[in-house]
Amino acid sequence: MSLHQFLLEPITCHAWNKDLTQIAISPNNHEVHIYKNSGNQWVKCHELKEHNGHITGIDWAPKSDRIVTCGADRNAYVWSQKDGVWKPTLVILRINRAATFVKWSPLENKFAVGSGARLISVCYFESENDWWVSKHIKKPIRSTVLSLDWHPNNVLLAAGSCDFKTRVFSAYIKEVDEKPASTPWGSKMPFGQMMAEFGGVSSGGWVHSVSFSASGNKLAWVSHDSTVSVADASKNMSVSQLKTEFLPLLSVIFVSENSLIAAGHDCCPMLFTYDEQGSLTFVSKLDIPKQSTQRNISAMERFRNMDKRATTEDRNTTLETLHQNSITQVSIYDGDKTDCRKFCTTGIDGAMTIWDFKTLESYIQGLRIM
């Protein structure tokens, strides 16, 4: 496990470049800071300043090396690097509320932006006019879209929103996509077609995060009522739901076809598995508890406490987890959704942690990634 404290401010979101030498983070404001790995240090090498509202989403395309950002200013920008300088291109989102989330498609020829305008902007590059344009998916979304994830076929798009529902839409754009093959989610995929809908008003909560499995047949999501759910399209859209005893989870991602990692307000990542019988099970918290020791507080810590907690005393508010506040995002660091070897978390404590499954397996008895 390696933990790096970037900031005192929360890290809103992050994204890695292809070779994992650079990470782009938003320090809870209108900027994106890019840090480069230099030995054991992370050195700030770029600041992207074009938004005039809080940045809410970052994604870094591994093949084309382009960054897309979105923010509360209702804008999205595609950033391309030329001669060592990042240049922004404005995207026409056509929304009247804040953008909340952004994600490149697997082929990197389009991206999707969720927003408070109760719609999803699917954006693609129009070469004749040399600009990024968008098409809207509106119905039947009834509230803010909080999270998105692309199916491996580059066409289907999962969305979690504040109306307690998780939906799968077709984001097929004839200008850039080849006609998609049939999937367990359906065969006819005109743009905006809703392929599936899960959840309801009677139960559930805001859907904070969604994730397709590597095959695209399974879809996981976490809600504000502390539930983890998995829908399996290959099993007639059957849904398995696990009501956990934990605080709400904010981020979820598949780390193998049947295992997923989720994290949130409990400040540590957790492993869940989904078996062939359609049963969803909590396996373990993936944290190594710190040894609590009594010690004298240094002058440096006294000043840090004044900044962080508005107090000069050491009241032993330190959590036993590595992260000292809620985890806001989980991402794969080494490997992919078929076989993840390391994953990364960032949180409100301004820290970034890289977790190694091999190290975790040696500490946690009986831990195996299925």
Curated annotation (Swiss-Prot):
This is Actin-related protein 2/3 complex subunit 1A-B. InterPro entries: ARPC1, WD40/YVTN_repeat-like_dom_sf, WD40_repeat_dom_sf, WD40_rpt. Component of the Arp2/3 complex. GO terms for molecular function: actin filament binding. Pfam families: WD40. Belongs to the WD repeat ARPC1 family. Probably functions as a component of the Arp2/3 complex which is involved in regulation of actin polymerization and together with an activating nucleation-promoting factor (NPF) mediates the formation of branched actin networks. In addition to its role in the cytoplasmic cytoskeleton, the Arp2/3 complex also promotes actin polymerization in the nucleus, thereby regulating gene transcription and repair of damaged DNA. Gene3D superfamilies: YVTN repeat-like/Quinoprotein amine dehydrogenase. GO terms for biological process: Arp2/3 complex-mediated actin nucleation. It comes from Xenopus laevis (African clawed frog). It is found in: Cytoplasm, Cytoskeleton; Nucleus. One of its GO terms (cellular component) is Arp2/3 protein complex. It comes from the Eukaryota. WD repeats lie at residues 6-45, 50-89, 140-179, 202-241, 244-284, 322-365. Keywords: Actin-binding, Cytoplasm, Cytoskeleton, Nucleus, Repeat, WD repeat.
